[in-house]
Amino acid sequence: MNQPPAAAPPALIYVIRHGEKPADPPAGATGAAPSGPPFGVDSQGNQDDHSLLPRGWQRSGALAALFDPATGPLQAGLQVPGTLLSPSYGSTAKTQEHRTYQTIQGLSERLGVPIVSDYAEGSEPALASQVVSQYSGVVLICWEHDHIPSLASSLPVTPGTAIPQAWPGGRFDVVWTFTLVPGTSQYAFGQVPQQLLSGDAATIIAA
């Protein structure tokens, strides 16, 4: 695994869900592709069930501008990330063809910061431990929504923090923020609506 130098805990950790994806197969279906359009497409425009929908690619581009605007200030509550993380799906090729990687690919290219994929979905406690013990600055994690609550609960948040126990299937438009409390090793939890695309909600995810 890629091991960055040991450093102080990150000042900020952002967690986002990947961009819009194809519909899931019908309940009970085995090995079936999504039932119909819209289809996922890879970076070359080929149909691919693991890739983003065209709207997801739009979000990917918009996220690059959200976290690194060409002009004007960043949105309140956000800073430019210096570390980008997404899940591993085995080989490098498979990882780079997956929507979690694709969602921050544009930001990676814009910043010149590689995407690190050391951990698979289901390894959230280990990922959280690595993030707080081996990274510094501002970290952005793009993850699969069913596993984001587990990741959030594995981070050292301030006592009594209410974190949503589920990420709604229809929400692709929120940034979860974890801000290091000065003088402590604990994080304050917050949420920032992205409001990047038509139809994005202005509300946060209820705890």
Feature annotation, model-predicted:
Residues 142-144:
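Short beta-strand segments
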Residues 139:
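Mobile, glycine-rich extracellular loop/lid and propeptide segments
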Residues 4-136, 147-207:
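Active-site-proximal alpha-helix that buttresses catalytic centers in soluble enzyme cores
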